[in-house]
């Protein structure tokens, strides 16, 4: 489960940004329910962001039981999805959450997948320059937060991202299929399901802005172009004033 802040938003909500209807679900969480949760960058209550110019083999994190405290801090979209799958299939479910608010898709792509795009400058990966903006630097989030996970067996991917790529929707139309193809290749298990969320109906640029609408069109086309993929629209569950919709359940 990856993406930017709309994937990261926990069941307990952000500061002054609650999630609707989660209090009862959090309170009723119990370890006997076979849902387990792992969030990269989070361990022992500490939050340390990890990124790298080169792929790393390990990342900080720990598997957590299904308890009220743990559930309150896990990604809401991820948890609702895991809860649904567990109830319907009656099997143990594990979710791995790797997110960073405000991140561009380029940061989540491997060097191999992004190299064909000549307009993207990869020179910082080969020099001594400091990475000052990891969320917009190609490959560094893949290297630090996805590469260490590729030895895990997974059954599919959830993706909630795109707001930070509104400035170049045409490029995004090519980047996203390359990103998905590379993820599937890295895990080597065929066309694993890839489900993603269309960006929220936030008033990004005012009434005359069109970049968000164009990005949504691109996401719709990507769903058609990427095999074994699906897209959830959020146009009817969001709000133009809040970039993080309070209704997380409807997304799933």
Question: In which residue ranges do the predicted regions lie?
Answer:
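Cell-envelope and extracellular/periplasmic
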Residues: 1-250
């Amino acid at each position: 489960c990856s993406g930017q802040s709309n994937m990261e938003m926990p069941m307990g909500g952000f500061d002054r940004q609650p999630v609707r209807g989660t209090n009862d679900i959090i309170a009723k969480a119990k370890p006997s329910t076979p849902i387990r949760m792992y969030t990269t960058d989070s361990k022992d209550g500490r939050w340390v962001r990890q990124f790298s110019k080169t792929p790393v083999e390990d990342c900080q994190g720990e598997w957590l039981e299904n308890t009220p405290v743990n559930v309150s801090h896990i990604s809401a979209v991820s948890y609702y999805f895991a809860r649904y799958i567990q109830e319907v299939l009656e099997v143990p479910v594990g979710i791995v959450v790797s997110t960073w608010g405000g991140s561009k898709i380029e940061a989540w792509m491997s060097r191999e997948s992004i190299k064909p795009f000549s307009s993207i400058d990869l020179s910082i990966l080969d020099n001594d320059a400091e990475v000052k903006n990891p969320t917009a630097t190609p490959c560094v989030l893949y290297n630090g937060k996805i590469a260490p996970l590729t030895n895990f067996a997974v059954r599919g991917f959830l993706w909630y991202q795109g707001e930070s790529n509104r400035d170049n929707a045409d490029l995004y139309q090519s980047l996203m299929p390359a990103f998905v193809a590379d993820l599937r290749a890295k895990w080597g298990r065929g066309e694993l399901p890839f489900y993603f969320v269309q960006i929220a109906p936030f008033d990004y640029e005012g009434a005359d802005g069109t970049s968000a609408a164009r990005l949504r069109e691109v996401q719709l086309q990507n769903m058609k172009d990427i095999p074994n993929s699906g897209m959830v629209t959020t146009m009817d569950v969001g709000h133009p004033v809040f970039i993080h919709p309070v209704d997380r359940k409807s997304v799933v």
